[in-house]
Amino acid sequence: MVTRRRLHHPEVEQVSKRQKVDKAESKNKKHADVAAERGEQSTEDHEDESQDKKDKKVVGDNRDEDEEVSPNGQEAAEDNDDRKDKDAKEKDTETNDEGTEKSHTDVNDDDDDVDESKEEDAAAAVDITKEKKDEQESDNKTEEKKVQENEEEEEEDENKNDEDVEELGSTEPVDDEKKGLVKFEFDGVEYKFKERASVIEENEGKIEFRVVSNDNTRENMMVLTGLKNIFQKQLPKMPKEYIARLVYDRSHLSMAVIRKPLTVVGGITYKPFNKRQFAEIVFCAISSTEQVRGYGAHLMNHLKDYVRNTSDIRYFLTYADNYAIGYFKKQGFTKDITLDKKVWMGYIKDYEGGTLMQCSMLPRIRYLDAAKILLLQEAALRRKIRTISKSHVVHPGLECFNDIENIKPIDPMSIPGLKEAGWTPEMDELAQRPKRGPHYAAIQNILVELQNHAAAWPFLRPVNKEEVPDYYEFIKEPMDLSTMELKLENNKYEKMEEFIYDARLVCNNCRLYNGENTSYYKYANRLEKFFNNKVKEIPEYSHLID
């Protein structure tokens, strides 16, 4: 009974309900807002049902009291009092029973709330799991979509590259521009030539060629400093102070290759002698990382056009070291100095170990268009050949060699076009003979080594009779390295012994004419020692050296 009364107390019941409702709400809020709303709705429904039961019970009690109370007589009053006492006892009993029933109902309701809360928690957990699963599936779909997009982009890039390759292999004008090809027509025939990378970059505005001097302007001084740094790096044997002095000398000019905005790639420093119509190229260098793009040749062409158009200079002179001789030869320089010595002797610096080279500029040639001019000359020559020869006619190939099992010799004169080309049986015999002897390659290598040796500069060319008038009175069999090179090209050396004889003759003549204390005598000894060592390195000719 105590338990029933305690459960029947309305405040205890209300606190218990609120605690359970709060607990259910806190759980539901952690899982999902939907579960919380369901829990609140369930709690409100239970409270409404309990309140409806209380209201119905109170209304029933009031009706009973109204029916039992009567206004007539004392007996009625006593009976009424007795009934009131009896009704009060019955009411207490009913109230207790009702409280017991209500307490059982509340307990059942609480159990239902707990069960519903658990069910709602489970439902919320299922919803959260479902949401996570949906999010994961969405992420997977997004990743798959990204991967698919990347694959599509890669395929597009590959297709684009394939299209570019196909375009480069075609003959459309746009593709020729991509490859740097320049087209023009001559006599209705289309000709093409490929521009250097440096020319393409200049046309695109990536590089420029600028003439600068020491005029104290900030930008020109920056360019000169960049040139000085390149010269000092590319010409390590030159004293750095000497390079700086000449680059900043106000009597010198420089043409620089500049990658925009202001990065010096290379250049040429030269000293003009306008009254004597020549200029001395003092330094010429391109940065080591940029030498494969044709900057050197394009720079020299720019310099030739600039000097010829702005002055009376018609010749270039320079002392080239062993590594620069090949470059200067390609740019039109030669070792044969045709310019009178009275014009340049004493005006340019003589470098020990360097080779003096000269370039004579043609007045009617624009060197930047030299490639196109040469191609036009070739086209004109081919046109002339077509008027006197049928060499441009292409005959079908021979079919007699298709059957390999039944090959038979044929008369060369029966081959279409062979006779018209001027072929004779004697020409076949000459063609089968070896052009060079077995010793040609060895002689050529040794001769190149001799010409590039530091002590060879006095022996590169024949002695000038004007400079040394009595030389040929003492030396009856003169010899020099350029004469040996000419004899080699004309197949005059039939044996290695003949080449060795001429090489020793060069040194013997020098020692015969010059005294032992002269530098020329020492140069001859050094060069002969170097020559003997080179021949000994070749096993088949080492026995020829004593």
Curated annotation (Swiss-Prot):
Q: Which reaction does it catalyse?
A: L-lysyl-[protein] + acetyl-CoA = N(6)-acetyl-L-lysyl-[protein] + CoA + H(+); (2E)-butenoyl-CoA + L-lysyl-[protein] = N(6)-(2E)-butenoyl-L-lysyl-[protein] + CoA + H(+)
Is this entry keyworded Transcription?
yes
* Region Disordered: start-end pairs: 1-176
Q: Which residues form the active site?
A: 280
UniProt biased composition (Acidic residues) = 108-119, 150-175
Q: Where is the composition biased (Basic and acidic residues)?
A: 9-44, 51-62, 81-107, 128-149
Keyword Nucleus carried by entry: yes
User: Domain N-acetyltransferase, which positions?
Assistant: 207-362
Q: What is its EC number?
A: 2.3.1.48, 2.3.1.-
- One protein family per Pfam: Acetyltransf_1
Please report the stretch or stretches of sequence annotated as the Bromo domain: 434-538
Detail which positions bind acetyl-CoA.
Answer: 284-286, 291-297, 323-326
Q: Which CDD domains match?
A: Bromo_gcn5_like, NAT_SF
Q: What are the UniProt keywords, alphabetically? A: Activator, Acyltransferase, Bromodomain, Chromatin regulator, Nucleus, Transcription, Transcription regulation, Transferase
Residues at the site labelled Important for catalytic activity: 280
Q: Name one GO cellular component term.
A: ADA complex
Which Gene Ontology terms describe the biological processes this protein takes part in?
Answer: negative regulation of induction of conjugation with cellular fusion; positive regulation of transcription elongation by RNA polymerase II; transcription initiation-coupled chromatin remodeling
Biological role: Histone acetyltransferase that acetylates histone H2B to form H2BK11ac and H2BK16ac, histone H3 to form H3K14ac, with a lower preference histone H4 to form H4K8ac and H4K16ac, and contributes to H2A.Z acetylation. Acetylation of histones gives a specific tag for epigenetic transcription activation. In addition to histone acetyltransferase, can use different acyl-CoA substrates, such as (2E)-butenoyl-CoA (crotonyl-CoA) and is able to mediate histone crotonylation.
Q: Return the similarity comment.
A: Belongs to the acetyltransferase family. GCN5 subfamily.
Report what the protein is called. Answer: Histone acetyltransferase GCN5
